[in-house]
């Protein structure tokens, strides 16, 4: 066999291997999307209620109470991989909490019917004979060393303190953000004391959504759109894009509604 034929056969084999490897890679990356295809739980998500004024949209939240969201299609696989890595870090801490016997509840999803609010606290821990909310966050080492606190995590813990108090009827006034440095595994504890003033804007949002929900039930009138059209940057990543603009899969009612 000539050297040219050998080279061609070798190249063909390498091409086939490359194609096969690409097919396997695509199939594995599809797993990140498939893992989210069943995430259609009913209710408002705490993270959406805590969004900034620029990102928060009443129309999106009211739609989410009646129609299915298309979130799996909106998040890029790269972002889903980051989420998966974060989940692995959370599991590390959950296992440690369980081994130490300080776990009261780990990732228990709760529902406030009054507000259609679904929320999941990372961990409720028994520390020094007191129930404390813990929210686990990861940071790159640069941010970890530069920041003293964790503003988004602190806001989240404060909201959970309010929500858990509403749910149980038992005051919960203390929590902390557990910040885990991605690169060197250093940790930081950011204490959070409940602030009624800080949580009020988000409680007001929940109340307003309930008013808008009843308006939609009675008149079928939705809040105004935040986005000018379905191709804006915000709309392209919106969980309720299809239902809002009645495109794609359109408005598919939730099974619970």
Spans of model-derived segments:
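General helical structural elements
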Residues: 31, 63, 141, 159, ...
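A residue-level signal for conserved active-site and pocket-lining positions in enzyme catalytic cores
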Residues: 57, 160, 238
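Metal-dependent nuclease catalytic cores that hydrolyze phosphodiester bonds in DNA/RNA
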Residues: 1-133, 145-146
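Structured loops at beta-to-helix junctions and adjacent beta-edge loops in soluble globular domains
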Residues: 53, 64-66, 137, 180, ...
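Metal-dependent nuclease catalytic regions and adjoining charged, substrate-binding loops involved
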Residues: 7-12, 16, 163-257
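A broadly tuned, weak detector of single residues within folded domains
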Residues: 50, 116, 153, 230-231
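Mg2+/Mn2+-dependent nuclease catalytic core
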Residues: 106-214
